[in-house]
């Protein structure tokens, strides 16, 4: 998906364009990379205006398209930041920094449910639970089928009160016992999944660090100039 809200497919053999599909353009470019997900020969993607589209992967034909923002927000794409789209069974899950968390039917685009959560981080789905972390630093666990909030825990208690407003979650993953959270100030939190309290806070950098990744039982973080491996 390019900056003009056009989805393009290319041949991996020669690089030729196979098909493209345009969605509505905004005169202001989004600050965040756009997301796409693939399942059952369908591509699901968002554009900078908040529209969610479903496209046939073989020919680029549009199956459905759903707006998530009102027409009054036509040129606020610069301010809209949407999370990665996660496809789980027959539903799409995503959220944004406009205090909206959506579940859509993957076949029709119809709304399953909507919840008021302010987050542009990729949600994590485990069995019937959705894990997300808000921009304000709350761990939120929801029921996948209904969107009902089961639990909410504030994660920044160990930081000084005057510093908390400066801290923004940058990305997280969920392990067997812990949740691993990176931040925009270079701090890395290990959170007890049962209590929702931070076990450990590590200083990795003074700037934003990447969403954690796990490979061969090791955890990796990326900073501006390095890749950091944690056991």
Where would I find each of the regions flagged by the language model?
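Residue-level marker for isolated small/hydroxyl-bearing positions within beta-strands
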Residues: 1, 46, 95, 133, ...
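A generic tandem-repeat structural signature
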Residues: 1-23, 33-35, 45
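Surface-exposed loop/turn positions within WD40 beta-propeller blades
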Residues: 4, 49, 98, 136, ...
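WD40 beta-propeller blade core
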Residues: 8, 17, 53, 62, ...
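Short loop/turn segments that connect beta-strands within beta-propeller blades
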Residues: 11-15, 56-60, 105-108, 143-146, ...
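Extracytoplasmic beta-rich repeat domains
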Residues: 16-40, 61-89, 110-127, 149-173, ...
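C-terminal closing repeat unit and adjoining cap/tail of repeat-based domains
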Residues: 108, 177-178, 183-231
